[in-house]
Amino acid sequence: MKLYSEELWKQFRETLGLKESPLGIYYTNDKPEGITPAEGISGCMMGLLQNARKKGTTVYFDKGHFGCPGGAYYMGFFESPRPNIEYFLSCGIPGEMEGERYIKTPERAREYFTRMIPRRAPATYCVFKPVDQFQKGTKPEVVVFFAPPDILSGLFTLTHYALERTDAVYAPFRSGCGTILTYPLKEAGKEQPHAVLGMFDVSARPMFEKDILTLAMPYSV
C-alpha cells in the first residue's frame, strides 16, 4: 500500500505539471535492491542520482560506496570531506593543491564547516528512490524535487501556504548534496522547519539539465 492516496498524488502532479517523481531519502540497515557506486572514490554522487530521477532506479550509498568524499561527508559517513578541505575550497596550497576559490580564505572555510556539521548516518545505507515507489512501513526523512522554474514557483507557493509563513524557503550557500540532504535533515529538528532551495553548486550543475533546480524538505513538511 502506498504512503498516500494515488488519486491525490495524480492530482498533485497534474496541477503542478510535475514531469518526474520527487526522490525520497532515508537510511536503513537492510541492503536495498538497486545500484551503488564502485568502492571508494568514483565520481560525484549527484550524477548517480540521475538513475533514480530518469529511470526510477533505487540508488544507495554506504561508508565504502559513496562516489565522492564530499558526498560521504554530507550523508554522515565521514567526519571530514578530505584533509585540508579549508584550503581546497579557498586558495589552495602552492605546489600541493589547487584551490577551488569558492570561499575567500581558509579561515572562512573553517567557519563554513563549523556551522554545518552533518548528522552522523544513523544506519548502514543512505537510500534515494522515487517517492511513488515507497510503500507503507517505510517513510522518507527528506523529499527532494528536481524541477524547472515554473514548477518550482508552484512548489514554492504551496510550501508557504502549507507552513503558513512567508519565510518557509531559503537558499544556503552549500554543495548540491548538502542542500538536498544535510540541511533538510537539520530543518527536520526545528520547531519551524524550512524547505531548502538548491542546486546552485557550480561543480554539480554540469550533471543536470540547465533549467533544473532542487527544492528539498523534511518529509513532515
What are the language-model segments listed below?
Residues E6-V221:
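Acidic, serine/proline-rich low-complexity intrinsically disordered regions
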Residues M1-K2:
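Ferredoxin-type iron-sulfur electron-transfer modules and their immediate structural context
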